[in-house]
Amino acid sequence: NTAVPNQIDGWVAQQHLHQLEHILETYAQQFMIVACHHHPFDMQSKWIDQHKLKNTNNLLDVLNKHSNIKAVICGHVHQDSLREWQNIQFFSTPSTCVQFKPLSDHFALDDESPGFRVLSLKENGELDTVVHRVANTQQKINIEISGY
């Protein structure tokens, strides 16, 4: 859980880091995917990067101790992305509503269709992922709004 009451940015509380550590130790013989709402790494969008996970290093310290983590998935950024760190793939997933324009210094919506990501983690640790977009949407986007 990366939610912080009355905040837009994220934080993983110490108790949740301990809980994650315990789960990763308990299931050390199984490959794992970790999910969180807030993005741990910059998206190269000034406006959204100020709302990322604020204690990324704490999370990475936990992840770095475990070789069974294949991926971390997050939302919050309303766009598809991939980054790799220490052989762990970090994915963001599109929103099922409006998309945020990638690589934007200021808040901006994208005209990309709503979508979602499917992850398939096989017993051998192989990870497959695909993003599906909603076809033929009649979505009307107000590009004049200054926030979401």
Which ranges hold each PLM region?
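Short, solvent-exposed loop/turn segments at secondary-structure junctions
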Residues: 2-5, 39-41, 78-79, 96-98, ...
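Acidic/histidine-rich helix-loop elements
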Residues: 5-12, 104-109
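Short acidic, glycine/proline-rich loop/turn micro-motifs
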Residues: 3, 43-47, 101-104
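His/acidic metal-ligating clusters that form di-metal
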Residues: 7-91, 127, 143-148
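Binuclear metal-dependent phosphoesterase catalytic core
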Residues: 62, 84-148
